[in-house]
């Protein structure tokens, strides 16, 4: 018979072994994920005012 509790414990043990192998603690995961997200979204939030100055306004034709 399949025991769900034994399966969950096995998954938890595997995750702990993986985390020990890569020397990652649970409290370091928050710092790691936030730094990765910050690095990924940095180019999107950087304002490039010099490029905005080079743009020409669009001409609108009114009927």
Swiss-Prot record:
One protein family per Pfam: bCoV_NS6
Subcellular location: Host endoplasmic reticulum membrane; Host Golgi apparatus membrane
InterPro entries: NS6_bCoV
Keyword Cell inner membrane assigned: no
One annotated Gene Ontology cellular component of this protein: host cell Golgi membrane
Keyword annotations from UniProtKB, A to Z: Host endoplasmic reticulum, Host Golgi apparatus, Host membrane, Membrane, Virulence
Family stated for the protein in its record: Belongs to the coronaviruses accessory protein 6 family.
Miscellaneous comment in the UniProt entry for this protein: Bat coronavirus 279/2005 is highly similar to SARS-CoV (SARS-like).
Function: Could be a determinant of virus virulence. Seems to stimulate cellular DNA synthesis in vitro.
Protein's name according to its UniProt entry: ORF6 protein
